[in-house]
């Protein structure tokens, strides 16, 4: 029984020696410092984005998010403004008249 206890302690000591002492396991596979320094050397450095460059801009260089907020505020937070709704209603009425429908005519 004492033999198994000594073997158990011996195996654990050898394992800790291999892992902590040399940094390798058996066949030379690096576990600690060498591989971790290589991995950090290959990591790209973080890019710090400024607030203005992180946002998309339109062709004129204006900030799209700010423009959309202004448009929605002007429309009263509706998907379409009153002008657009009136235009679409007029177009639908013209199409219905062209088709010969007198009242709401859907395909």
Swiss-Prot record:
Found, by tissue, as follows:
Expressed by the venom duct.
The secretion signal range is 1-24
Task: Give me the residues of the propeptide, which is removed upon maturation.
Answer: 25-80
Q: Which UniProt keywords apply?
A: Calcium, Disulfide bond, Gamma-carboxyglutamic acid, Ion channel impairing toxin, Ionotropic glutamate receptor inhibitor, Magnesium, Metal-binding, Neurotoxin, Postsynaptic neurotoxin, Secreted, Signal, Toxin
Which InterPro entries does the UniProt record give?
Conantokin_CS
- Coarse class of the protein's main subcellular location: secreted
Where, subcellularly, is it found? Secreted
Residues annotated as binding a divalent metal cation:
91, 95
Judging by the UniProt lineage, the source's domain of life is Eukaryota
Q: Which cysteines are joined by disulfide bonds?
A: 101-105
UniProt key word Ribosomal protein: no
Cofactor, free-text remark = Divalent cations stabilize the toxin the in alpha-helix conformation. Zinc also stabilizes the alpha-helical conformation.
Per the UniProt entry, the effect of residue 85 to L is: No change in potency for both NR2A and NR2B
The chain residues annotated with the modification 4-carboxyglutamate are: 83-84, 91, 95
Per the record, its GO cellular-component terms are:
extracellular region; host cell postsynaptic membrane
Instruction: Provide the residue span(s) of the region labelled Disordered.
Output: 26-64
Q: Which GO terms describe its molecular function?
A: ion channel regulator activity; metal ion binding; toxin activity
Q: Which cofactor does it need?
A: Ca(2+); Mg(2+)
Site feature Significant for the subtype selectivity between NR2B/GRIN2B and NR2D/GRIN2D (potent for NR2B/GRIN2B but not for NR2D/GRIN2D), where? 85
What is the annotated role of this protein in its UniProt record? Conantokins inhibit N-methyl-D-aspartate (NMDA) receptors. This toxin is potent in the following order of preference: NR2B approximately NR2A/GRIN2A > NR2C/GRIN2C >> NR2D/GRIN2D. Induces sleep-like symptoms in young mice. Is a highly potent anticonvulsant compound.
Note, other? Exists in two forms, due to cis-trans isomerization at 106-Tyr-Pro-107.
Task: Quote the record's domain comment.
Answer: The cysteine framework is C-C.
What's this protein's family per the entry? Belongs to the conotoxin B superfamily.
What name has this protein been given in UniProt?
A: Conantokin-R
């Amino acid at each position: 029984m004492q033999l198994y206890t000594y073997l158990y302690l011996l195996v654990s000591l050898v394992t800790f020696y291999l892992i902590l002492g040399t940094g390798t396991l058996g066949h030379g596979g690096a576990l600690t410092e060498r591989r971790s320094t290589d991995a950090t050397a290959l990591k790209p450095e973080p890019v710090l984005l400024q607030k203005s460059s992180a946002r998309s801009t339109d062709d004129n260089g204006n900030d799209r998010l700010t423009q959309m907020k202004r448009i929605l505020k002007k429309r009263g937070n509706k998907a379409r403004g009153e002008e657009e709704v009136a235009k679409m209603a007029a177009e639908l009425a013209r199409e219905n008249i062209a088709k010969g429908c007198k009242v709401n005519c859907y395909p």
